[in-house]
């Protein structure tokens, strides 16, 4: 099982603390995200690109230590509500008895399975051919986009799913689609925003110039702070019956992402070429983006855990992260629109000549996705069948 799904198994189904639990888990993840750019930037930004190899070595060492820590301590801390260790065999008692077990054992089960495999194989071949026509021999894109469709379809073909389970899985798929737009804009942090920090941001503080890579630590620093606050906020709203449903929280996250880019648009508007903008604009962007991330990412992990039948817990968590992989690929494409002197780039007829034009792409994209998700929230809540 994935670590993300293990967090959900620490609680009973329907436990209202799950959103807060995933937020705390997310805070822990971002402690590492905060330290990594500082360490790698310290060893790597020496003027010699080859020195970044030490960053990879440090990452490998820490990964090995993490695996050792997990394996030696899991039986002590990963204990479910019933007192049993987690991550071995799914406890069927935790799953609501909605599926008809006799249907799973029907005489047609084997034939249906073979038919499903054949359909999935044909679908994969057809999609791979279509994406090859779209992207040429970009096999990474072909693989990611094909998997993003084939794996979700494979779960829907499962004959044991009830209508309620199918509806809940559809909710995950729909929100995962919108999450692609969030991460495609958000992950400019590792591409165009880092380039912007390096080339067009004044990073001098009291005579000392901050390495551009260190700005990557702003976001996880804000995550750790806000993640300590948000569980209390959601808990207080829940006690008053005012806590937003998961789809609404996701829409709020997208809206905050759009507002963050609007802030940086104000910072770069009418700035003359060669003039660097204040670091405060980029700091404001990262702070607002972090608020959006806290509303969307840990809540999304919690939602997947709450809506997924336990027999598909790890697979559905993988599909959720597959949407992030798609978003990162999309983010790379969008970062290619970064303005260059003497070049005019376009997106759907929109001309991109300045940083203002570039950042407005993400303002509009995120705001549009947020508005549509807000409009769909009520319908999605009904499809969740009582899960909050």
Question: How would you label these PLM feature ranges?
Answer:
Residues 252-274:
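C-terminal ends and interior cores of transmembrane alpha-helices
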Residues 144-156, 208-240, 253-261:
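Transmembrane alpha-helices of Major Facilitator/SLC transporters
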Residues 13-14, 41-194, 199-204, 234-240, ...:
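Intracellular loop-helix junctions on the cytosolic face of multi-pass helical membrane proteins
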Residues 17-38, 44, 58-66, 121, ...:
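Glycine-rich segments within core transmembrane alpha-helices of 12-TM secondary carriers
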Residues 35-51, 129-136, 228-236, 330-350:
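Transmembrane alpha-helix termini and helix-breaking/packing motifs in multi-pass membrane transporters
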Residues 13-25, 52, 206-209, 279-280, ...:
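Loop-to-transmembrane helix entry/capping segments in MFS-fold secondary transporters
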Residues 175-180, 273-295:
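Hydrophobic core of transmembrane alpha-helices in multi-pass small-molecule transporters
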Residues 1-12, 294-309:
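Intracellular juxtamembrane helix-capping segments at the cytosolic ends
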